Curated annotation (Swiss-Prot):
InterPro entries: Ester_Hydrolysis_Enzymes (IPR051532), SGNH_hydro (IPR013830), SGNH_hydro_sf (IPR036514). Its main location: membrane. It is a single-pass membrane protein. Keywords: Membrane, Transmembrane, Transmembrane helix. One of its GO terms (molecular function) is lysophospholipase activity. It is found in: Membrane. The keyword Lipid metabolism does not apply. PANTHER family: SGNH HYDROLASE-TYPE ESTERASE DOMAIN-CONTAINING PROTEIN, THIOESTERASE 1/PROTEASE 1/LYSOPHOSPHOLIPASE L1. SUPFAM superfamilies: SGNH hydrolase (SSF52266). GO terms for cellular component: membrane. This is Uncharacterized protein MPN_407. The chain crosses the membrane at residues 14-34. Coiled coil: none annotated.
Length: 879
């Protein structure tokens, strides 16, 4: 006897099969169906209420097919498997007597409703399922690749050439291509309220006018499910959309993926979803019955009740408080399900915890102020206001104004105000100039505080800030990144700009001078990219770059392009904007030019390019591969091509951020950056090229990290370690580095993001940690050789228990001894491992791993008292 089929969707079977079918006949059909894989799939699920008569009346006249089997659905999309997943299928094209290898287009376009939007309140800047799939698609290896193939081929020697080494080859004549898995480009066209009718009618304008995606993905959405009077229109529009993507007769070499919406904890909404999912599947079945070519071009991913859906989906932690939206864990699970269904047959599933962030909130407030110098980067949202001196705002007897003036007037020296303080609107910086020259080169320490006469400190504590700067001979070195100053002072056009300037001489003579000064506001009327965008309903953004933009080092969190997309849609109401990241790990200017048709020329009607190339060029320059002049030629050629392709577009051109990769090439780094910084000033480019100044950004970030540094020391190991903006042995930007990268883009474009959700986004994780002064009891770590199950046993001393002042996350890092591949699991506590250890067992059993278990505890600290923090690092390592 065949295994009984589990029926997953429901419909009023009597009404659907027609009123002429008797009850007895129906049950005969039903019982026969339970024994066959070709039985009707859509029958009543006893756990869900029957659909309303409205649904029945609307669906029945459509005459949609009902005999859809799970086996048949699984067989759809066969060409997707062979053509899209065959990463090494390349066509050779003769070019200048050489063979130019053309990679297949692996581009995806997602469309649907609000389910595709990463709202900040729910995800806190972390990835949604589309971005998780992007990570799998572009970073994780495919075991079906031919044996002996490497993940990446940087150089393929010239056709019929006897040159053997990289240095023998003229770089412009190289055959350079990245491993195809990195070439997957994913764009998200979803926005809240968008229906299938909207998608179909705007498909040419919103999608095809930009580029032609190899694969179009549609997720059945709430916007469509809620419209019970809509089914015939839905079928017609879905049919038309599929044909636009794969061809009227499925003749195009394109694909369509149908995602069926996940089950929710809202039974009434589940009823609507079930009907919509049925209609969508039946529409596909109708097309495949008419023309079998469609069956090879359409793939279905059933998140509603597919075999791969976790059994605890409704009872687990996959849904948000609204019972419908995905939680962070749910987003990860849906991304994983996509990867499982769409990957090559036999591919290893992504271990469930590998890149899943933990966003459990830590109470961050004045009572538990933490030291941001030691904590960064692992999934905790916090306010990054800097308060150098601890202030008890809750003390009813505390008066900030009195405290400030009592200190300031202690040794008051009366003097005229020698300083002019100007707020620079464009750069959002305070410019301080002195009318006097200090002949002795004495230094002055400055502090600002608001005039609180009309303010209530308890309502606006962030409007107070003490920060220090040093003045020597008219020049000021401000030791705090301007974003904090702006956030704290909160300077607005309609707000009084009367601030108190406190000056302290370092020689101890004339200890305090208090000057009741005015901050001037400089009006900047220079047109910005923001002015260009504000009248556009939809703006199209294209990132071109290397691993810094690709997202290497984010460990499952959002890269700068993904954060920008979230910010545009959440903070600025630009929910129709499209952000495409074409950046490729390892790319350089020669590679971009060589692959221009695939990298950037295929994208049309781009409004803003973000161009960030140079790190790998510098490294290859150091190897003697090519010259500075060739880099300059390549870069300007790319700019010319972009401008020719989209004359109306603006280019945000980044200079090169510091990285441990460039430690031996500092001279070249300065040469490249001098060249890049001069391009926006060149009359040939000044009208459309805008500098994204990463060098200045990281100099300021070093200062806010408490590191006294200048341009010549940006490659200092201490800075790369302590600044908490780098990952991957300090060669790439960490998740916090990507946040700053994104903020810098917003600033350059002209968005005022200071009061947005992203203004205070930051993450906590391992930083530059000192060895623990306290020894904790080591846990016992064992791995069962037969099952692969890893057990951790630990008796936690009472003093280490979690309390309101700290937390004890557990980090388990697995390092593959064959290829040094590393994955990290983040647990909230030791016992949490019990829930997941069996998921990892098959994975651990078949590979050779070194296992490091780490625990860190944060306690109450302040900026000035860093030694109060107790860190517990490596506990045990076991092979």
């Amino acid at each position: 006897m065949k295994k009984r089929t589990k029926y997953r969707y429901w419909l009023n079977s009597l009404a659907f099969f027609g009123c002429g079918v008797s009850v007895g006949a129906f049950f005969t059909l039903f019982l026969m169906g339970t024994q066959s894989d070709v039985s009707p799939l859509f029958v009543k699920n006893i756990n869900i209420q029957l659909p309303s008569s409205t649904h029945q009346q609307k669906i029945e006249p459509l005459n949609l097919p009902t005999n859809i089997s799970k086996t048949e659905i699984a067989s759809w999309g066969s060409e997707f498997q062979s053509k899209v997943l065959d990463f090494y299928a390349r066509d050779g094209e003769e070019h200048d007597n050489k063979i130019r290898y053309q990679l297949p287009s692996l581009s995806f376009a997602w469309t649907g409703g609000k389910e595709l939007v990463s709202d900040f309140a729910r995800l806190h800047g972390a990835r949604n399922f589309v971005a998780y799939f992007d990570q799998y698609w572009r970073f994780w290896s495919n075991p079906n690749w031919p044996a002996g193939q490497v993940d990446r081929v940087d150089v393929l020697c010239e056709w019929n050439s006897d040159k053997q080494t990289i240095s023998d080859i003229n770089f412009s004549d190289q055959f350079v291509f990245a491993s195809a898995r990195f070439e997957g480009k994913i764009a998200n066209f979803g926005f809240a309220g968008q229906t299938m009718k909207d998608i179909n009618e705007s498909f040419q304008e919103r999608v095809l006018s930009i580029y032609k995606p190899r694969t179009l993905v549609y997720l059945t959405s709430q916007a469509d499910a809620e419209r019970v009077d809509y089914y015939e229109e839905f079928v017609n529009n879905l049919t038309a959309l599929i044909k636009k993507q794969v061809g009227e007769k499925a003749e195009k070499d394109n694909f369509f993926i149908l995602q069926l919406h996940w089950k929710t904890n809202d039974s009434a909404f589940n009823e609507k979803l079930s009907v919509l999912n049925f209609v969508a599947l039946a529409t596909v079945k109708q097309l495949t019955d008419q023309n079998r070519n469609f069956a090879s071009k359409i793939k279905v991913v059933d998140h509603f009740e597919g075999d791969f859906v976790p059994s605890d989906w409704l009872s687990g932690n996959y849904l948000s408080e609204d019972k419908v939206s995905l939680s962070l864990q749910g987003e990860f699970a849906i991304g994983k399900q996509l990867a499982q269904v769409l990957k090559a047959t036999g591919a290893e599933p992504l271990p469930v915890e590998v890149t899943e962030p933990s966003l459990e909130a830590i109470p961050i407030n004045e009572e538990t102020q933490f030291d941001v110098k030691n904590y960064y980067s692992f999934g905790h949202y916090h306010d990054t206001n800097v308060i150098n001196d601890r202030i008890d705002f809750d003390d009813p007897n505390y008066n900030l104004e009195t405290d400030f003036f009592n200190n300031a007037k202690a040794n008051l020296v009366t003097t005229s105000n020698p300083f002019t303080v100007t707020w620079k609107t464009k750069t959002k910086e305070l410019e301080i100039e002195s009318t006097e020259v200090n002949p002795n080169g004495l230094q002055y320490q400055l502090s600002f505080a608001s005039d609180f006469n009309a303010r209530d400190i308890k309502k606006r504590p962030t409007s107070y800030l003490r920060w220090n700067g040093t003045i020597t001979n008219k020049q000021i070195d401000i030791s705090l990144y301007w974003k904090y100053i702006h956030k704290a002072l909160d300077i607005k056009e309609n707000e009084p700009l009367n601030y108190l300037l406190q000056i302290t001489r370092t020689d101890g003579q004339g200890s305090y001078q208090v000057i009741n000064g005015w901050i001037n506001k400089e009006k900047d009327n220079t047109p910005t990219i923001f002015d260009f965008l504000k009248d556009k309903t939809q703006a199209n953004w294209l990132f071109i770059g290397d691993s810094m933009t690709h997202g290497v080092g984010t460990d499952g969190y959002s890269s700068a392009p993904q954060l920008l997309e979230q910010s545009l849609k959440n903070d600025f109401g630009r929910y129709r904007d499209v952000v495409i990241n074409s950046a490729i790990n390892g790319s350089n200017t020669s590679l971009e030019l060589y692959m221009q048709n695939h990298r950037f020329k295929q994208y049309k009607n781009i409004d803003v390019y973000v161009l960030n190339l140079g790190t790998n060029d510098i490294n290859q320059l150091a190897q003697g591969v090519y010259t500075v002049e060739q880099y300059k030629h390549n870069l300007t050629q790319i700019l010319d091509l972009l401008h020719t392709q989209s004359p109306q577009a603006h280019v945000v051109l980044a200079n090169i951020a510091p990285s441990s990769l460039l430690r031996s090439s500092e001279k070249n780094w300065k040469t490249f950056n001098d060249f890049l910084e001069g391009i926006p000033k060149d009359s040939n480019y000044s009208s459309f090229v805008h500098l994204l100044d990463q060098k200045s950004l990281f100099l300021q970030l070093a200062k806010v990290s408490g590191i006294d540094i200048n341009e010549n020391k940006l490659f200092n190991t201490d800075f790369l370690k302590k600044s908490f903006y780098f990952a991957d042995k300090f060669s790439h930007l960490s998740v916090n580095g990507n946040v700053e990268y994104m903020r810098n883009i917003l600033t350059t474009v002209g968005f005022d993001w200071q009061n947005s959700a992203f203004a205070s986004l930051g993450y906590l994780s391992f930083g530059y940690l000192k060895k623990p002064a306290t020894v904790v009891e080591l846990p016992e770590v064992t791995v069962d050789d037969q099952t692969g199950v890893l057990d951790i046993k630990q008796s936690v001393p009472p003093k280490l228990k979690v309390n309101k002042q700290g937390f004890e996350p557990v980090f388990i890092t697995f390092t593959n001894t064959n290829n040094n591949e590393q994955v990290t699991v983040v647990l909230n506590n030791w016992s949490q491992w019990e829930t997941h250890k069996t998921d990892f067992a098959p994975w651990l059993k078949c590979k050779h791993w070194n296992i490091d278990v780490k625990q860190i505890r944060r306690v109450k600290t302040t900026f000035r008292d860093q030694e109060n923090a107790n860190f517990f690092e490596l506990i045990e390592s076991k092979q």
